[in-house]
């Protein structure tokens, strides 16, 4: 009897403990949730890209091994371009022969294989675009991707580039304030990459590039002085001041009157039928300080007896 009473007391204590514990009761009462449904997640568009929406949708639908976050960096080695061509031509190009690296040797090797494939398929990609993509020139990879899109889909797209790409940062520098623009040395360092010097160590070619950048910087400075004369304290010349103060219509009328007066030459009427002689007439033309003599036959006014 005593043992049975002890067992009943132990059962009642454990039941009371379970009722009092707040952490166990909600876990037992909560229903078991199923696995979350998988939703289709599209990769985000690359930051500050100048690709059109149709090209971005096309890249998202290709299911690439990784989506490009930085257009200039991710397309420079040619691995993603090779993967795109492998999707369209799986039996003619093997992705295993390409390497996803950042060294100059890897980039040149991948693009050399791509150039052979393009020549075999008679696809034409400008070498300037390939060169600019390898060396991460601003705005060049976007044009290359649009060319590849046109070759593979046979669709024409309207480029959204602001201006023509000249493989320099000239357009970017012109949009900056005058204080923030780079100097000549900084412009040369920014536009001639180290990879260009390593791939083409010809000193003459690099000197010509540097001279071109210096001339471009001088042109940029002259244009800045013309557009912002107050900043550079450029004083107008005497001719500019005169043209600014004179009205356009009045100055044009005065000039026409001067020209007309200078060109008028008096001619004597014919009198009688006597002998003729010659007389010098000095005429002053507008805009000239020299006189010239014109020989005019004039009949003699004296009558013969």
UniProtKB/Swiss-Prot annotation:
PANTHER family: SPERMATOGENESIS-ASSOCIATED 4-RELATED (PTHR12509), SPERMATOGENESIS-ASSOCIATED PROTEIN 4 (PTHR12509:SF8). It is found in: Nucleus. Residues 49-155 form the Calponin-homology (CH) domain. Keywords: Nucleus. It comes from Pan troglodytes (Chimpanzee). One of its GO terms (molecular function) is microtubule binding. One of its GO terms (biological process) is regulation of cytoskeleton organization. May play a role in apoptosis regulation. GO terms for cellular component: axoneme; cytosol; nucleoplasm. Its main location: nucleus. This is Spermatogenesis-associated protein 4.
């Amino acid at each position: 009897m005593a043992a049975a009473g002890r067992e009943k007391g132990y059962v009642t204590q454990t039941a009371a403990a379970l009722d009092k514990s707040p952490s166990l009761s909600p876990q037992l009462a909560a229903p078991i949730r199923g696995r979350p449904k998988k939703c289709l997640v599209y990769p985000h568009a690359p930051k500050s890209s100048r690709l059109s929406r149709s090209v971005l949708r096309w890249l998202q639908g290709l299911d690439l091994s990784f989506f490009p976050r930085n257009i200039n960096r991710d397309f420079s080695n040619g691995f993603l371009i090779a993967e795109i061509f492998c999707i369209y031509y799986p039996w003619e190009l093997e992705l295993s022969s390409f390497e996803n690296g950042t060294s100059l040797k890897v980039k040149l090797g991948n693009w050399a294989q791509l150039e052979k494939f393009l020549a075999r398929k008679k696809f034409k990609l400008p070498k300037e675009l390939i060169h600019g993509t390898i060396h991460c020139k601003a705005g060049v990879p976007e044009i290359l991707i649009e060319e590849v899109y046109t070759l593979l889909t046979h669709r024409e797209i309207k480029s959204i580039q602001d201006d023509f790409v000249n493989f320099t940062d000239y357009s970017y520098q012109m949009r900056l304030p005058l204080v923030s623009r780079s100097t000549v040395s900084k412009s040369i360092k920014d536009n001639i990459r180290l990879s260009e010097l390593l791939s083409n160590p010809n000193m003459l070619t690099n000197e010509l590039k540097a001279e071109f950048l210096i001339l471009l910087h001088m042109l940029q400075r002259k244009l800045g002085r013309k557009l912002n004369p107050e900043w550079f304290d450029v004083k107008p010349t005497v001719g500019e001041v005169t043209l600014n103060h004179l009205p356009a219509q009045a100055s044009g009328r005065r000039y026409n009157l001067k020209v007309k007066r200078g060109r008028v030459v008096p001619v004597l009427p014919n009198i009688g039928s006597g002998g003729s002689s010659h007389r010098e007439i000095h005429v002053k033309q507008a805009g000239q300080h020299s006189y010239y003599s014109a020989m005019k036959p004039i009949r003699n006014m004296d009558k013969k007896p």
